[in-house]
């Protein structure tokens, strides 16, 4: 099996959609048109509503994975990503913040990374 390279990822599909979607969610937050936007209405309901939705979507991902249904998993993971982006916008956490954290972890074993969190 050939070694995986990050360069093999189609940059348009893998990296451009998240910034585009993030900007759209920021716009929905700013415009706050709760009658016309699901995202704006969810954010207007507050943090608990956003977190509840993330919990629901997380559970749906688990169920889809358990059912071994590829298309259902894709659908539910996309829903979860969308709602995580809503949370990020809600708390002003940028994609750059997440990128920096993942980059920091890239060459660190999971065991070492968890140990470093315990010290903080």
Where are these regions (language model features)?
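Flexible "arm" and connector segments at domain edges
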Residues: 1-77, 81-120
């Amino acid at each position: 099996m050939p070694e995986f390279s990050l360069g093999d990822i189609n940059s348009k599909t893998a990296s451009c959609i998240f910034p585009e979607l993030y900007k759209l969610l920021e716009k929905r937050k700013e415009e706050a048109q709760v009658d016309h936007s699901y995202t704006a209405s969810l954010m207007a309901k507050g943090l608990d509503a956003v977190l509840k939705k993330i919990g629901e979507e997380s559970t749906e991902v688990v169920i889809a994975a358990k059912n071994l249904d590829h298309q259902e998993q894709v659908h539910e993971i996309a829903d979860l990503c969308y709602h995580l982006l809503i949370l990020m916008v809600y708390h002003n956490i940028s994609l750059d913040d997440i990128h920096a954290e993942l980059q920091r972890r890239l060459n660190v074993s999971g065991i070492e990374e968890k140990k470093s969190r315990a010290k903080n």
